[in-house]
Structure formats: structure tokens, C-alpha cells
From Swiss-Prot:
Positions of Mn(2+) binding: D22, H213, H215, N249
Gene designation per UniProt: leuA
Annotated organism of origin: Thermosynechococcus vestitus (strain NIES-2133 / IAM M-273 / BP-1)
Function: Catalyzes the condensation of the acetyl group of acetyl-CoA with 3-methyl-2-oxobutanoate (2-ketoisovalerate) to form 3-carboxy-3-hydroxy-4-methylpentanoate (2-isopropylmalate).
Top-level taxon: Bacteria
Entries under SUPFAM superfamilies matching the protein: 2-isopropylmalate synthase LeuA, allosteric (dimerisation) domain, Aldolase
Listed name of the protein: 2-isopropylmalate synthase
Length: 535
């Protein structure tokens, strides 16, 4: 259902996903353009109203990502595609250019309004900030009809000055005014009062949607947002799995399911009868779990087991009393059905006799759109897996597809061969062959404290890019001794963190490929920093 303006016609809560912009600011969560496009497509299937695709002026990579998402996802039936821009002409021009292919483009511009930011960061007076905000919103409006304005650090801004800024930018053409709790400082009561104050003291607020953006430094982001909805906010800026810098952002899945499960409580705040069963958001909740796994795999950020809604233990019961109750009637200890978020028992869908068309069809049904090259590689992986595993599940297919969509960087380093030798009375030794970006094949060997350490040492002898391994984790995709193992690693180089992910029934091979994927991201990062030192 398309957003309608003026905003008083907005009779539901709009979901503004900023996974690709604010979420990517998590250390090590950097994504390449193809990965961003994959996530954007899934966000569209999920039903988000607005996708903040990036910060076009920040780097050529961000510009390209926003432009490609605008072209492929920003269709007439797709979501609004948004680009972030500081309150400067060059930022706004870059955003407008990147967003041009989108059917529904939005420019999101911002400037700080708290006295501490004005004094120490901007070194400007309130009058100067007021003029800049009004002028830049009007400038953005000259490119697109849909303009969002954020007064950065609104939670610590003087309310009277905040009201004045918001009134001016709405007069200048802002269709959405976003209230950020930039440092995650406010409590629900304070945040609700802030939104209520804006609703009551900004004379033209009925001409704009009130949006909220918050960080989770005190673990209050979701609670703050729900209080904001009760006081008039109609757009929530959030990320999948709550990823983001520091403690992260408000988690989309928690907000959406809170509004779904407790809709009878929230209905009156949106002018609906309490008994209304109509959803409060446009989200297809059955796509939540799939989207969560996709973002986790591509960013390399694991989901804590006890994470609400999408954690591995979210629907698990250890207590015997709880287990007995759930077996008799799920609602004794579960407030929602796991199937609501797309978490269902996976059926055996394919076997070793299945053909390429059946494989491709099932991947499309699972939401994956692979290129011909990716599909060919994925099918070979599937046939190889089918020879090793008796049962193939959807989780197995997802692991293969995500591995291929993350992709091997054909212009970077490629792992051609890996072999290890180890045992309880042998020193772990690894031999690897790596193809360099110039096409040269190099082979080397190393001894380590274990087989994975030996592989990494051997790869390092070939690649010779200084780095420090700061995280290594293995997760089983399915049950059974023949399960695919997913390996996620994070490397640090100077002040940057890079992640890599791979899946294989052989954990050593998965570990080696995950390491190569991370090294290629590091390699590309070094190239970009050399070409664009300020990016």
C-alpha cells in the first residue's frame, strides 16, 4: 500500500529501514554493492515502506549502491528509495543524482540542533543553523517532492529551538521530520513527551509525518519508539537485527512484532477500534526470519541466541513445565506462532536426482535471484552436497545461495587448493594454492596450533596483507553429523574491521574461503582508500 500525502491520511506506522546506511556503520559490517542490492531486494519483499540505501556523497561505492538500488528496487510498485545528505549543496546534489532512477525518491538531509553540537562540532549560532536547515530543505525540494529533515541530537536540543527549526523546514517543503535520539540517551517517558511536545507546539506539524530514529545505548530504543507511536510518531527508522554503530539501532523485527502482537493495545492511538485486526504496518512478517538470516550472513554479524524474535532460543523451551504446556497448547508459553515470522519446519525439497530447473525454481521461491553465473556455481555446489548428504533442506539451499551471492571476488585473491594434515601426534600443517589478482598461482605451506590456524598462516604467507583475526565462529546450518557448517570471521587492519563468511560440509574449506572473502574485502578497502583518501 503506497504512502499517501498529506500525512494526516497516514493511518498506519511506516517502516523506514536504514540497515544499508546506519546498520552498515557497525564495525566490520561493510557490504559491497551486490550485497547491498541483494539485501534491498529482500527488504522490498519484506514490505518496508522506505529503504535508506546509503550516503551517496560519502564514497563512489555508496553512490553506485544507491543508484543501482534506485534502478532495480525503486520501481512503481516498490518502496521509496532514500539517500542521506548533509545540509550542503554538494551532498544534496549527489543524492539527487543517485536517486534519479527511483520512481519514489527521497532526500534525507540533516543538521545538528543541540547546543553542544552547535558549539563544538558546527561552530555555528542557532540563527545560522536555522537558515541552513530551511535553505537546504528548499534546495532538496527542487530535486524531489519527498524530503525528510532530521535535527541531529534532537533529544538534547532546546525544545523551543527545536520547534522553530521544524516549523521552518516544513514551510520549506519537508514532508517528514525525523526526531533522532542520536546517542540513545532518552527514556521512554522522556521520548514520548518530546514527540508530544512537537505535536502540540509546531503549528504546521499536520503537514509532515513525524519520524523517530534511535540508538540502543541503554537498551531502550524499541521501548522509546513504541512510546513515540502512542504520542503521534508514524514512521520508525530501524534496522534488521538492530545492527548499527555502538549498541545498534532499534530492531525492525522487534518493533513490527510488538505492534502486531499488541495491536489491540496500540489500535486506539492510531484512531482504530481496539478490536481491529488490521495490521499496523505493511510488513509481511513471514519474511522476517529469512531477512534476518540474510543480513546476518552478508554482514558477518551473528545473532545472539536469546535475541527477541529471531534468536535461536526465541521459541525454545528448556523447562519441563514449559515444554509440557507448549505441547498441550502453544499459547500457554508462547505469545506468537513461530510461523508468523517465517520460522517453520524445513521440508526435504530436493535430492541428488533433482535437475537445474527444479533447483533454480526452489531458490526463487526462497527469495533468491541469482545470475546465470551464480546459479551455475550454486548448482554444482548443490550436486556436490547431494552426494555427501542424505537429506537436503531449505536451510542448506539458503546457505549455498548466500555463499554464492556473497560471491568470490574474481578480481581479487582466489583460493584454488587447500589441504591439511593433523592428528593427536602430528603438528597441524596446511598447504594452499592462491591465485593473485594479477593471475599468478602461488603455493605455500605453514604449521599452526591447529588446522585452521595452519591454513590462515599459509594464506598469509601468500597474500601478505597485515591483519589481525579478532573473531572466528562456526555454526551448524542443520542438525546431523553431515550438516553444512557456516564460518564467519572478522579481521582488523589498522582502524577498520572486515568480515567474511562461507559455508561447506568441510569446516576447514569453509574456514579458508571465509578468510579469503574477508581478505578480499580488506584488499578492496585498501584500494579504495588509496584512490579516495577522504572516503
Amino acid at each position: 500500500m503506497r504512502i499517501k500525502y498529506p500525512p494526516q491520511t497516514v493511518d498506519r506506522v511506516l517502516i523506514f529501514d536504514t540497515t544499508l546506511r546506519d546498520g552498515e556503520q557497525s564495525p566490520g559490517a561493510s557490504l559491497n554493492v551486490d550485497e547491498k542490492l541483494t539485501i534491498a531486494r529482500q527488504l522490498a519483499r519484506l514490505g518496508v515502506d522506505i529503504i535508506e540505501a546509503g550516503f551517496p556523497f560519502a564514497s563512489p561505492g555508496d553512490f553506485e549502491a544507491v543508484q543501482r538500488i534506485a534502478e532495480t528496487v525503486g520501481t512503481e510498485t516498490g518502496p521509496v528509495i532514500c539517500g542521506l545528505a548533509r545540509a550542503t549543496r554538494q551532498d544534496i546534489e549527489a543524492a539527487a543524482k543517485a536517486l534519479k532512477p527511483a520512481y519514489y525518491p527521497r532526500i534525507h538531509t540533516f543538521i545538528a540542533t543541540s547546543d553542544i553540537h552547535l558549539e563544538y562540532k558546527l561552530r555555528k549560532t542557532r540563527a545560522e543553523v536555522l537558515e541552513i536547515a530551511q535553505e537546504m530543505v528548499a534546495y532538496a525540494k527542487s530535486f524531489v517532492d519527498d524530503v525528510e529533515f532530521s535535527p541531529e541530537d534532537a533529544g538534547r536540543s532546546d525544545p523551543e529551538f527545536l520547534y522553530e527549526v521544524l516549523e521552518r523546514v516544513i514551510d520549506a517543503g519537508a514532508t517528514t521530520v525525523n526526531i533522532p535520539d542520536t546517542v540513545g540517551y532518552t527514556t521512554p517517558a522522556e521520548f514520548g513527551a518530546l514527540i508530544k511536545g512537537i505535536k502540540e507546539n509546531v503549528p504546521n506539524i499536520d503537514r509532515a509525518v513525524i519520524s523517530v530514529h534511535g540508538h540502543n545505548d541503554l537498551g531502550l530504543a524499541v521501548a522509546n519508539f513504541l512510546e513515540a507511536v502512542k504520542n503521534g510518531a508514524r514512521q520508525l527508522e530501524c534496522t534488521i537485527n538492530g545492527i548499527g554503530e555502538r549498541a545498534g539501532n532499534a530492531a525492525l523485527e522487534e518493533l513490527v512484532m510488538a505492534l502486531y502482537v499488541r495491536r489491540q493495545y496500540f489500535n486506539p492511538f492510531l484512531g482504530r477500534p481496539p478490536e481491529s485486526e488490521a495490521p499496523l504496518t505493511n510488513i509481511n512478517t513471514r519474511e522476517i526470519y529469512k531477512t534476518s538470516r540474510l543480513v546476518s550472513n552478508l554482514t558477518g554479524m551473528l545473532i545472539q541466541p536469546n535475541k527477541a524474535i529471531v534468536g535461536a532460543n526465541a521459541f525454545a523451551h528448556q523447562s519441563g513445565i514449559h515444554q509440557d504446556g507448549v505441547l498441550k497448547h502453544k499459547q500457554t508459553y508462547e505469545i506468537m506462532d513461530a510461523q508468523l515470522i517465517g520460522l517453520a519446519d524445513n521440508q526435504i525439497v530436493l535430492g541428488k536426482l533433482s535437475g537445474r530447473n527444479a533447483f533454480a525454481t526452489r531458490l526463487r521461491e526462497l527469495g533468491f535471484e541469482l545470475s546465470e553465473t551464480e546459479l551455475n556455481k550454486a548448482f554444482l555446489r548443490f550436486k556436490d552436497l547431494a552426494d555427501k548428504k542424505k537429506e537436503i533442506t531449505d536451510w542448506d539451499l539458503e546457505a549455498i545461495a548466500k555463499d554464492e551471492t556473497q560471491g568470490i571476488d574474481l578480481q581479487g585473491y582466489q583460493l584454488e587448493f587447500v589441504q591439511v594434515s593433523c592428528g593427536d601426534h602430528a603438528r597441524p600443517t596446511a598447504t594452499v594454492t592462491v591465485r593473485t589478482p594479477s593471475g599468478e598461482e602461488l603455493t605455500d605451506a605453514a604449521i599452526g596450533t591447529g588446522p585452521v590456524d595452519a591454513v590462515y598462516r599459509a594464506i598469509n604467507r601468500v597474500v601478505q596483507i597485515p591483519n589481525r583475526l579478532i573473531e572466528y565462529s562456526v555454526q551448524s546450518v542443520t542438525a546431523g553429523i553431515d550438516a553444512i557448517g557456516e564460518v564467519t570471521i572478522r579481521l582488523q587492519h589498522q582502524d577498520r574491521i572486515y568480515s567474511g563468511h562461507a559455508a561447506n560440509t568441510d569446516i576447514i574449506v569453509a574456514s579458508a574461503q571465509a578468510y579469503m572473502n574477508a581478505l578480499n574485502r580488506l584488499y578492496r578497502g585498501l584500494e579504495q582508500r588509496a584512490l579516495h583518501p577522504q572516503a
